[in-house]
């Protein structure tokens, strides 16, 4: 307790007793890594942490100095405790085996060490995203152990490094936010049982890619942009930060819908965001807060990955808007949204008046 308030350590211990303390101990190690990363991000240019390296990750993205430093921080904080069978990261081509000198556990930790790292040089909020799975037995993990649907996650969370550092966590019993008290060094429960409003009038998408979107996404965004004069009959606000953690955090606090949909900009990629360590943990957090998360055609947490760095379309946030966009995808796929062309009466649209939908 901190001045009568619940600390992260107390919270995870109380909520992970069934794991004999192993899951709680792992989460406390993750929190320690988050504190280290928070200090790194805060020092920024003072410590020479800004700028890029002469290396790329498995996605072909140029690595920032902070990408590598934060990745190493998580490995060092979490590899030694005996809870893990292995780790995987956006910044590593292959799964990371636990060093031989440390005991093995039955958990798998997958993470994006610094989401939105391109924003670090311009002092915009960035974050860390993580997901935890459980194996049936302790020992060294194999690649197949990681290729499981997000519905099998036992915990997921993110840290956001902004005006304050927060860690948002779910153990499958709701979504909860903890704020770092820098005086005591403790994470304190400040946002218990976060709930995402079912309706929203705010959407986040990179509109520079509009020409590459599929028709259902173009339809949805067009309706939102039309505002009161359009079929929705209401005005919408648009947001885009280019940091998934910052976007999702805003949605958890005040509602909204975040879209990084499938597009044709690079036909070889079914989506932009990585399924295992970006889409899955965020989907679990959003669903546990009463929201929804979809690829447009499937619940994100039901997608079975076939590779470690698989990408997926992501649409998540306020439930009614996510379901509307999923319906638009279904109507597009079945042809229900195609206009009817009459030889006598020109063209009639089969779109319903969405102001009454």
Curated annotation (Swiss-Prot):
UniProt name for this protein: Fructose-1,6-bisphosphatase class 1 2
Catalytic reaction equation(s): beta-D-fructose 1,6-bisphosphate + H2O = beta-D-fructose 6-phosphate + phosphate
Cofactor(s) for this UniProt protein: Mg(2+)
Cofactor note: Binds 2 magnesium ions per subunit.
UniProt-listed InterPro entries: FBPase_C_dom (IPR044015), FBPase_class-1 (IPR000146), FBPase_N (IPR033391), FBPtase (IPR028343), Fructose_bisphosphatase_AS (IPR020548)
Subunit structure: Homotetramer.
Listed EC numbers: 3.1.3.11
GO-annotated molecular function: fructose 1,6-bisphosphate 1-phosphatase activity; magnesium ion binding
Classification of source organism: Bacteria, Pseudomonadati, Pseudomonadota, Betaproteobacteria, Rhodocyclales
Pathway, per record: Carbohydrate biosynthesis; gluconeogenesis
One of the GO BP terms on file: fructose 6-phosphate metabolic process
Localisation: Cytoplasm
Binding site for Mg(2+) 1: 90, 112, 114
Gene (name only): fbp2
Protein family per UniProt: Belongs to the FBPase class 1 family.
Species for this entry: Dechloromonas aromatica (strain RCB)
Residues that bind Mg(2+) 2: 112, 115, 278
Binding-site list for substrate: 115-118, 206
């Amino acid at each position: 307790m901190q001045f009568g308030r619940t600390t992260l350590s107390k919270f995870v211990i109380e909520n992970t007793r069934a794991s004999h303390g192993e899951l709680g101990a792992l989460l406390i190690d993750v929190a320690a890594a988050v504190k280290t990363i928070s200090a790194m991000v805060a020092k920024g240019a003072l410590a020479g942490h800004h700028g890029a390296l002469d290396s790329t990750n498995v996605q072909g993205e140029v690595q920032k100095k902070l990408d590598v430093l934060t990745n190493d921080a998580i490995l060092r904080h979490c590899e030694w405790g005996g809870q893990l069978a292995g780790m995987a990261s956006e910044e590593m081509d292959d799964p990371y085996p636990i060093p031989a000198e440390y005991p093995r556990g039955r958990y798998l930790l997958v993470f994006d060490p610094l989401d939105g790292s391109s924003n670090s040089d311009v002092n915009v909020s960035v974050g860390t995203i993580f997901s935890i799975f459980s194996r049936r037995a302790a020992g060294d993990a194999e690649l197949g152990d990681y290729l499981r649907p997000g519905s099998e996650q036992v915990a997921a969370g993110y840290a956001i490094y902004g005006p304050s550092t927060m860690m948002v966590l779910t153990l499958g019993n709701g979504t909860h936010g903890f704020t770092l008290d820098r005086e005591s060094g403790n994470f304190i429960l400040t946002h218990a049982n976060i709930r995402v409003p079912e309706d929203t009038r705010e959407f986040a998408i990179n509109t520079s890619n509009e020409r590459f979107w599929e028709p259902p996404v173009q339809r949805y965004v067009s309706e939102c942009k039309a505002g009161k004069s359009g079929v929705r009959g209401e005005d919408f606000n648009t947001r885009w930060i280019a940091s998934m953690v910052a976007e999702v955090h805003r949605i958890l606090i005040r509602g909204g819908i975040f879209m990084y949909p499938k597009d044709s900009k690079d036909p070889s990629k079914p989506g932009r965001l990585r399924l295992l360590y970006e889409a899955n943990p965020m989907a679990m957090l959003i669903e546990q807060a009463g929201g929804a998360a979809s690829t447009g055609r499937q619940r994100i947490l039901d997608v079975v990955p076939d590779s470690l760095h698989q990408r997926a379309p992501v649409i998540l946030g306020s439930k009614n808007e996510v379901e509307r966009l999923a319906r638009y995808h279904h109507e597009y796929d079945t042809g229900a949204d195609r206009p009817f062309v009459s030889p006598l009466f020109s063209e009639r649209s089969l779109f319903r008046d969405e102001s009454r939908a």
